[in-house]
Amino acid sequence: MKLYRQLLVTQHLSKLRFSCARYSTSTCRYEFQIKNTRNIGIIAHIDAGKTTTTERMLYYSGLTRRIGDVDEGSTVTDFLPAERSRGITIQSAAVTFRWPPLNQATTSHDGHNACVSYTINLIDTPGHADFTFEVLRSLRILDGAVCILDGVAGVEAQTEKVWGQAQKFKIPRIVFVNKLDRVGAAFGRTVRQIGSRLRGYPAVCQIPWFEKETGKFRGIGDAVNLRALWWKGESDGKNIQSFDMKELLQEDPNFHGELIKARIALVESICDFDEQLFEEWLAVNDDSLSINAQSIWASIRRCLIDGSGRLVPVFAGASFRNIGIQPLLDAVNDLLPDPTERPDPEVSIENQKCGLSEILQGRLVPNFTKNIKSATMKTLSNSLVSKIEACALVFKVASDIRRGVLVYVRVYHGRRVLQMQASDAVEISCLDKGQIGVITGLKYARTGDTLIAYPNFNPKIGPPSPLNVVQLRPIDIPPPVFFAAIEPHSIGEEKNVAETLGLLIREDPSLNLSIDEDSGQMLLSGMGDLHLEIARDRLINEYKAKATMGNIEISYRESILHATPENHIVFDREIAGKKAKAACGAIIEPIVQLATDILQKTDNFTTIHNGNLITVKFLNSTSPEELNQKLPPDLSSSLVQSSLTNGVISALSRGPRRSYPLHNTHVTIIINVESDLFSKETTPAALASVARLAVQDALKESHSNGHIIILEPLMKVLISCDDTSLGAIVHDISAARGGHVVSLGTGINEEDAIELPPIDIKKIYVPKDNFTITDINDDTNNTGQRRQVIAMVPLKEMIGYLKHVHSLTAGRGTFIMNFHRFERLKGHRERVL
């Protein structure tokens, strides 16, 4: 099915002429356009102000005529009814705008960035932990990101999570400390937390400016350009008064002195990372004030662009009060990379990885050995890859009432056709390499698909191998841990409900639909209770499906304790009125090491599916050429492999003990081409059936021997509380919930961790906060400071935990949790189940 979908997508793209060769554009103009493109995302913890900041960006760019409000439900990027009613972002939204607006930009002859209007493709992402996968699939296609921090709460748990994910993709990031107008906002404390929790050295480019008498947040001090910006009154943020250093000395002498300290600290901190600026600093006798702003911006960019996260530019503002947005947009233009400055996107071809440029240039992945499946890569040639007209990654699929299915793509090679303004599609003449846009009319495309335009191919078999299995930047979909039954109101509604659920799953692959074989019920699985609640709301209210969702339950798994002996069977019966015959053997064993390690060592056809390894082993065959010669005329090695794999997947979807899906098993299908295949009687359906029956028989035999176990989801829980509540939280986790505490402290998430050395936060420059209860030198040693508990807890014990943690912490505690692994259910917990 997957291959079929890819073929249809490719066929449609070829009809669209998705190719840069179809348009006459000078190379110079094209390079100028791509150099002035920024693909960025807004990432943060929930309620940090992502959507509010995005709305201001759209307003100041001239794309909208009024500022949308989250509380009113009038935002552009939160356009789903569920988003507007709940006031949270559920889906990533794509929007394109120019900054500065075209009417404010002028032609530049010296290349100064401020005179050029840039195209910014912006993705506003969710902050809730249930929608982490939505963030992940957006991160794949970004060239840079703006991380927004709540100036009151500081670095929060989900912030660390998404920061770690961006670190894995090596995405350059800048930080915007938001909500500095709020009571309790502490810019200095938040900056220190960037160093202690995110492990990046904060380069403080802006500092907050407060009124002397009232302490009200009025603007920012720009340490790079040595100026102060004052946003006057309760305006729309366009009335800005700028003060140079001489004027600032008259207006606010104390802030003038602080801004000088900030400039000196900024230059000295950057010199530790950039040798070029260090030499320039030495040339002016260590005078940080005499270095021009262009040199500082260029130096920060050099440190930032590799995505290492070692230096973190920090900016200040208050989005709701319209303060600080325009300088933030300038920083996006000046600091974040264009598409040509990012590393070559990773491509997977049958579990082997290489760069896209290697494919387009006909070069091979260096580590090909005797692996049968990777040997097909040797057929790559310049004549083969030179025909690739376009290549794009589907990172999102959405349904539109007027235009049907919209397929969001990031173009990596070639050009084509629409751009999105959140919920509105705007047709454009073409979509260049490096751009983000939308294609309509792709009936079978799903999130994660790779789109290739290839001329003159056979629509039945698609482009030549191995181009028909190329995958751009593949990511693993985390296993769903909650499920609920979907019950249509009548038999006549079943088809419509199933089709509607299919649309939801195309949009969000972290949802999963299965059918209970005993009851026939449709079971919808997801990443969390909120995730499924949103799916239910969309199913009933948006798509008007006549169905009811049952109670949300936990999704358990089954696994095997010991390896089974080879179970060899022969399938010989009619399928659709035609004789079908095939044979194979099956061995099932538990996975005792990482599946990826096994994948790298095996010399057979091996795939990973839902936490299981599936291997197809052909006896007495050493190469694809030899194998294909032995197969019946209507079969190929890839078709045999996919048919057998589909049969195994079907068998593993339902265990013998409690009908839960199998997990953490390694299934090996053994097939002798000479004795297990029977000419024309061996069809793909026969191969799938014999593999399914062989695995099911082996599982039943294992169950009769008491070797099938139950697994439950184990969650990694991050609880934020104050010192006074810490003891109660730890006791509750350990005693009442059957969990175990992994660590206490400031809570650096080791699994997503930033692979950088710890930073001495006492060396970090921060201005004095507008109010301070104590002199904060770190986040862990003061009574009343926020602490974080990292624990492993069974998912069942975390149901309804939010109310409980509020009770234990007097309403001040928060938590997030993410799936960690499936763990064996034992003793009392197994008996209760």
Q: Where are these predicted regions, by residue range?
A:
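Short, surface-exposed connector motifs at secondary-structure boundaries
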Residues: 119, 143-147, 170-176, 308-313, ...
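Accessory interaction regions appended to the cores of large information-processing enzymes
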Residues: 193, 202-208, 213, 334, ...
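Amphipathic alpha-helical transducer elements in NTP-driven molecular machines
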Residues: 34-37, 51, 73-74, 87-92, ...
